[in-house]
C-alpha cells in the first residue's frame, strides 16, 4: 500500500496542493483529472517519489521518510512510470530500450522475455531491431508499456499516457494499461479525457 497523508506542495510561494490524502492498494485503478495548473502531475510525482512534498508524508508499504538510496530502490523494484512523451531513447533500438527493464534480472533469457513483452503489446519480434524514432507515437507508447511489463512493477504512475495519440491508438494503449491493472498492478493515471477517467474504480477530481 501507498499512503499519502496531508501532503502539500508549493511553487514560487504559491500553494498548488494542500493536505492531499489517498491510500493506494494493489489492483487499484485511479484516475486524476482537473484543469491545468491544479496540480495533477504534482500529485502523481509525489506519489511516485519523483519529488518530495513540502509537508505531509508518503508511506510506501509501511516505510516513511525514505532516504535517497531507499527511494531509488523502491523506484527500481516496485514503481513504473508512463509519460505523455514516452520517455524512450530515440536513437536506440527497441531491444536496447526494453533491456533497461532487465538490467537487474539475472539468469533469465532476455531475448525470450522481450518477445513475450512485445506479444503483450501486439507488436511482432521484428520491432526489436527498429530504432525508436522510426516508430509512430502509438507504437512508441506500446514499447514503453512493454518495458513496464518486463519491469514487473507493483505500482504504475501514468501522466497523460494517451495525450499525444489519436482515438484508435488511445484505445489500444489504454486497453493495455487496463490489462496491466488486471494483472494485479495498481495504476494511478492523470488524464484530460473524461471518458477514460470514468473507467477508473476511483476518480479524483481536482
Tell me what each language-model feature is.
Residues 65-80, 182:
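ABC ATPase NBD coupling module
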Residues 56-66:
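Conserved ABC transporter NBD signature motif
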Residues 156-159:
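Catalytic Walker B motif of ABC-type/P-loop ATPase nucleotide-binding domains
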Residues 131-135, 139:
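Conserved ABC ATPase signature
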Residues 48:
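Helix-to-loop junction immediately C-terminal to a conserved catalytic motif
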Residues 145:
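Hydrophobic anchor residue at the start of the ABC signature
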Residues 109-126:
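Conserved ABC ATPase "signature" region
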Amino acid at each position: 500500500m501507498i499512503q499519502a497523508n496531508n501532503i502539500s506542495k508549493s511553487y514560487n510561494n504559491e500553494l498548488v496542493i494542500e493536505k492531499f490524502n489517498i491510500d493506494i492498494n494493489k489492483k487499484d485503478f485511479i484516475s486524476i483529472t482537473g484543469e491545468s495548473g491544479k496540480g495533477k502531475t504534482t500529485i502523481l510525482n509525489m506519489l511516485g517519489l519523483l519529488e518530495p512534498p513540502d509537508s505531509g508524508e508518503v508511506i510506501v508499504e509501511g516505510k516513511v521518510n525514505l532516504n535517497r538510496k531507499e527511494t531509488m530502490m523502491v523506484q527500481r523494484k516496485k514503481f513504473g512510470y508512463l509519460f505523455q512523451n514516452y520517455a524512450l531513447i530515440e536513437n536506440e533500438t527497441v531491444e536496447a530500450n526494453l533491456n533497461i527493464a532487465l538490467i537487474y534480472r539475472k539468469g533469465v533469457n532476455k531475448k525470450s522475455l522481450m518477445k513475450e513483452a512485445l506479444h503483450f503489446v501486439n507488436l511482432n519480434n521484428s520491432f526489436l531491431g527498429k530504432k525508436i524514432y522510426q516508430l509512430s507515437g502509438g507504437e512508441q507508447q506500446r514499447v514503453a508499456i512493454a518495458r513496464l511489463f518486463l519491469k514487473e512493477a507493483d505500482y504504475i504512475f501514468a501522466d497523460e499516457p494517451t495525450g499525444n495519440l489519436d482515438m484508435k491508438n488511445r484505445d489500444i494503449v489504454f486497453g493495455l494499461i487496463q490489462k496491466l491493472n488486471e494483472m494485479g498492478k495498481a495504476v494511478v493515471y492523470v488524464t484530460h479525457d473524461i471518458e477514460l477517467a470514468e473507467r477508473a474504480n476511483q476518480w479524483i477530481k481536482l
